[in-house]
């Protein structure tokens, strides 16, 4: 029995209690929202991760870190270093490897990760088909489904399943005047398979069996957005919305079967359209968790897309997004280094909290209030210890040596907090004031 079925029966499990304690909300509310599909526990029940990661309504915004090899760069040691970065800064981790021994790489990443690990199974079967049959679209439906099952057996907790795109949508998108017809790698693979084989989406054709597999492991289906906009000029066109409508129907069928499901979102979206993108998705799907790639509000930001997209991510988080998929400085340019992975993860950690201050209110802002209290007292030790990156903060604080006065090296003796504390002491000691 999966966690949704348990919640629908009114049961309160140890996992629900753990979520309640972690997030600071009543356990009955956790149970009820799980039963409605509004809270998911990202896990593979047979191979639970070391970190508990719930996402959904009323919970803190979580951050996903993408790593993985490419056909150009296969360096497992580097990817395992990225896992360490993800363990420190992230909540979930996706292995998007497309180069090397994909089975071995995935298993090593899962072993090294404290976090639930996700994959895109069509990558593997497409690449294997390309190598063995001289064409990526030559794989069979059974081979795709067997790959999904293999990933589940390895302990994968969630998978991007591009089931929303139909053959008709794919053909029309490719013939359209979209700036970039398809930017999703997995979505493009499924589209190519449908056109090559003149057949409907293999995930859709075998949807009931896909649900059975995920139900067995109580893992999470992440419904991919194959037709997400890859340019701000393509945002919210008929193809993105058409796929979302198909996805919403799949969400309902998954929840009816007691299968955990979330929906993936764009992408490239102008700043003024981000909030209503979230509202539209939540309305169409009944409020299941939303997993969004930023979004990027501009297309010209590389090599600073981690900054540009964090702006969009803060707005999407504040508007109700539950899981943010980070971008790195290498986005749109190449495979990220370990350092670039860290830069992206930190930017998104900041964006997630900025959104939570709006979405969760005082519960999230307590952290900021505590830092501000110590800052006002010039209590550097306590203030720095509470910051998002204490180690880096201390390095900056001491980069010109230890300040000669109680203030920092920016204001020195002219620090307003130092002056204010002195005036408070004078007011307190004067009987005439």
Swiss-Prot record:
InterPro entries: ThiC, ThiC/Bza_core_dom, ThiC/BzaA/B. GO terms for molecular function: 4 iron, 4 sulfur cluster binding; carbon-carbon lyase activity; zinc ion binding. It is an enzyme of class 4 (lyase). Pathway: Cofactor biosynthesis; thiamine diphosphate biosynthesis. Pfam families: ThiC_Rad_SAM. NCBIfam families: PRK13352.1 (NF009895), thiC (TIGR00190). Catalyzes the synthesis of the hydroxymethylpyrimidine phosphate (HMP-P) moiety of thiamine from aminoimidazole ribotide (AIR) in a radical S-adenosyl-L-methionine (SAM)-dependent reaction. This is Phosphomethylpyrimidine synthase 2.
